[in-house]
């Protein structure tokens, strides 16, 4: 594939993603908090700091991996980096493979660091890149963490995608052992299982982003790029973010879990944190805001999102993220069926 074709693919991904609509209903609607009428705290008591063994984020939301590798996507990364700088959010760039192949593309990613020199930035590579390239991806952005995306359904629907996955787990293990910053194993919208969590724990992984279905749908994106658009029947493949978080419950004391995939509102973010996530990522909401409404409007959107999270936490009498994990939740019969059939232990305080 030529560099021009790769740039074209990056642009197609963004165009199709922006055209996708948010789901009217999701599994976040199938879980409810129990309301208690009189909080014992005030809004000003709320601490939204997200703390993991290696990373401290001012807020438990971040701009998740999206793009880079073309002139248009450079402009997107530039604007998102300004939003991150002005709001204090962490930001992940999209796959840096284009820059690792072609130095001319590096600035489509490094613009994020240029615009946000003091901010927290995650670099991003695939599970098949050599260790040396993973190290290079971290150095490229002076990144505080490295996402490794695992996207086998996307690759298999992508006309020119990868068809070989046998070496992925061993390669991830090699990268984790060599890279000095936290390595986050990130799904791309298909969710994670307890079996995967076991395998990742065995090779020393300390961070995951479950990225469940419900947000940007890469099966649909790649199917749109197929000549016959003949794999639409896979549109609903995978676990939702709620199901994925429940799958991680037994591993949350050893692995820091981030949540993304289909988060629409501050309440969805709070529900993710209550299920054990340390932070929550969003992609398309930020992309649509910054492209359709500009930087200032997107900054205001983030600030409002944060204030709404504080209001919800006050209603829940939760001063911090850890308090949220002790709050009472009622699940729908459908979610309870998943929990029972998958033999998940979700005992809560």
From Swiss-Prot:
It catalyses: isopentenyl diphosphate = dimethylallyl diphosphate. GO terms for molecular function: FMN binding; isopentenyl-diphosphate delta-isomerase activity; magnesium ion binding; NADPH binding; oxidoreductase activity. Substrate binds at residues 9-10, 95-97, 154. Its EC number is 5.3.3.2. It is an enzyme of class 5 (isomerase). Keywords: Cytoplasm, Flavoprotein, FMN, Isomerase, Isoprene biosynthesis, Magnesium, Metal-binding, NADP. It is found in: Cytoplasm. It comes from the Bacteria. Mg(2+) binds at residue 155. Its cofactor is FMN; NADPH; Mg(2+). Its main location: cytoplasm. One of its GO terms (cellular component) is cytoplasm. CDD domains: IDI-2_FMN (cd02811). Pfam families: FMN_dh. GO terms for biological process: isoprenoid biosynthetic process. FMN binds at residues 65-67, 95, 124, 186, 211, 216, 262-264, 283-284. The keyword Transport does not apply. Involved in the biosynthesis of isoprenoids. Catalyzes the 1,3-allylic rearrangement of the homoallylic substrate isopentenyl (IPP) to its allylic isomer, dimethylallyl diphosphate (DMAPP). HAMAP family: Idi_2. Homooctamer. Dimer of tetramers. NCBIfam families: IPP_isom_2. Belongs to the IPP isomerase type 2 family. This is Isopentenyl-diphosphate delta-isomerase. It comes from Staphylococcus aureus (strain JH9).
């Amino acid at each position: 594939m030529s560099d021009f074709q790769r740039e074209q693919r990056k642009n197609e991904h963004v165009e199709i993603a922006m055209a996708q609509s948010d789901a009217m209903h999701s599994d976040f609607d199938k879980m409810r908090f129990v309301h208690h009428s009189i909080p014992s705290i005030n809004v000003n008591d709320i601490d939204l700091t997200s703390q993991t063994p290696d990373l401290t984020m001012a807020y438990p939301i971040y701009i998740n991996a999206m793009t880079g590798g073309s002139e248009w996507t450079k402009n997107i990364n530039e604007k998102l980096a300004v939003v991150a700088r002005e709001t204090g959010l962490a930001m992940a760039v999209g796959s840096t493979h284009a820059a690792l192949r072609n130095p001319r593309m590096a600035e489509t990613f490094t613009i994020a660091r240029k615009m946000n020199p003091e901010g927290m930035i995650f670099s991003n590579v695939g599970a098949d890149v050599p260790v040396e390239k993973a190290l290079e991806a971290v150095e490229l952005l002076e990144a505080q963490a490295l996402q490794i995306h695992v996207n086998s359904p996307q690759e298999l629907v992508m006309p020119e995608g990868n068809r070989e996955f046998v070496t992925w787990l061993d390669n991830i293990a090699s990268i984790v052992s060599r890279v000095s910053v936290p390595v986050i194993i990130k799904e791309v919208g298909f969710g994670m299982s307890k079996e995967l969590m076991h395998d990742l724990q065995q090779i020393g992984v300390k961070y995951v982003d479950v990225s469940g279905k419900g947000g940007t749908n890469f099966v649909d994106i790649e199917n749109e790029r197929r000549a016959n658009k003949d794999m639409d029947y896979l549109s609903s493949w995978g676990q939702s973010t709620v199901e994925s978080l429940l799958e991680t419950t037994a591993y949350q004391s050893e692995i820091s879990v981030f949540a993304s995939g289909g988060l629409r509102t501050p309440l969805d973010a709070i529900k993710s944190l209550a299920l054990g996530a340390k932070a929550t990522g969003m992609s398309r909401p930020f992309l649509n805001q910054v492209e359709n409404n500009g930087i200032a409007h997107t900054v205001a959107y983030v600030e409002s999102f944060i204030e709404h999270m504080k209001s919800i936490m006050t209603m829940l009498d939760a001063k911090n993220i850890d308090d949220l994990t002790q709050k009472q939740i009622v699940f729908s019969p459908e979610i309870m069926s998943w929990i029972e059939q998958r033999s998940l232990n979700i005992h809560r305080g």
